[in-house]
Design a protein with these regions (language model features):
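Active-site hotspot residues in diverse enzymes, especially metal/ion-binding acidic/histidine motifs
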Residues: 1-174
Length: 174
């Protein structure tokens, strides 16, 4: 798979589900895909888990994380599921009585593991779809984007300012 494929799949999912508003309701998307979301206190370095027995799956999210982080984690785990990432016992994966558990831990954002990079790109495009980002930017008047604009956009999409900055840069808007 590729990052481009992950981005395309996220955009198609948003379009298919008719998500034309901000913020994108990521929990509703998870539920629609048959991925119930559970909030629990996880290890200090774990943001979320995708737990699957091959038939049923659910997402477990760190209850102590900020809401914007939780939303990104849910979208990230949806990405793993939607992209049908196959995990083997080993790095970031634990096998417990036939259940495969994919952790979103500290290496999820280090840019090394291709599956994690794809899931991160999927999450960014799911939470900040190109069409909606461009529409919101146009509503700001068309001038250069300043820090307070990035903050406004991050608030509208309920993502971190860092995530919004990266997304705007990737779209050539910064």
């Amino acid at each position: 798979m590729s990052v481009r494929y992950a981005r395309t799949q996220a955009e198609k999912l948003v379009e298919r589900l008719g998500r034309n508003d901000t913020p994108v309701n990521v929990e509703m998307i998870a539920e629609h895909l048959g991925l119930p979301v559970v909030y629990a206190e996880l290890g200090a370095d774990v943001s979320g888990l995708l737990i699957s027995d091959g038939t049923d799956a659910h997402i477990c999210v760190q209850a102590k994380d900020a809401e914007v982080r939780q939303r990104f984690t849910i979208a990230h785990e949806i990405g793993h599921h939607h992209l049908r990432h196959q995990f083997e016992p080993g790095h970031h994966v634990h096998v417990d009585r036939g259940h495969y558990i994919s952790e979103r831990g500290p290496r999820a954002s280090d840019g090394v593991d291709p599956k994690e990079v794809e899931a991160n790109q999927f999450a960014a495009c799911l939470l900040m779809p190109t069409k909606l980002v461009r529409e919101k930017v146009a509503e700001l008047g068309g001038g250069p984007l300043l820090d307070h604009h990035v903050s406004q956009l991050a608030g509208a999409f309920q993502v971190s300012e860092q995530a919004m900055t990266i997304r705007l840069s990737r779209l050539g808007l910064l």
